[in-house]
Amino acid sequence: TADPDAVLAADRIVLPGVGAFRACMDGLAALPGMIDALQARVIKGGAPFLGVCVGMQLMADIGEEFGAHRGLGWVRGRVRALTPSPELRVPHMGWNDVVPVAPHALIQPGEAYFLHSFAFDGDEVVATTDHGGPVTAAIGRDNVLGVQFHPEKSQRYGIALLERFLEWRP
C-alpha cells in the first residue's frame, strides 16, 4: 500500500523490494508519512514485520549501493557489495542452504532461492548461506525479520516461512 493509515492499521507488514537500496528508500520517503507510519507500527507498536531482499536490506543503518545511504536503522549494520572473483559469480543467483546461526521462531534450516549483489554485514544475523564464505541470509530481533532470499520463489521452504510469519505472535 501507499497509504500510511493502512500501515498503521495493519496486523503485520511485509516490505518486499527489488532494485537499488537508495531507490527503494527514496520510494518510501516519497510517500508522505510512510516512514513514520512504519516506525510507529513496527518499532513502537510491535507489529510483526518481514523484509524481503531489499526490504531486508532497508532495515540496516546504511546501504552502500551507489554511495552510502541511510536505511531505516532498525538493525545495526551496513549493506555492502558482494565481491566477485573468477570462482564467484555476482549477482548471487540460485538455490542455497539457509543455515540458522541464532534462534529465531521463523527460521529453520532449508534451501531457498537467492538473487542479490549486496549483503548485510552487522548485528542480529539469525541465518547465513554460503557464497564464497558466509553471507547473511536472515536478520531479526523482537518482532522484525528480514530475509535476503525470496520466499515467494523458494517453493515449500518459502511457503512454510510465510505460513509461520502469518501465525507469528512475537
Predicted regions and their residues:
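Amide-donor transfer/coupling interface in amidating biosynthetic enzymes
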Residues: I43-K44, G77-P170
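Cysteine-nucleophile active-site neighborhood
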Residues: G19-H92
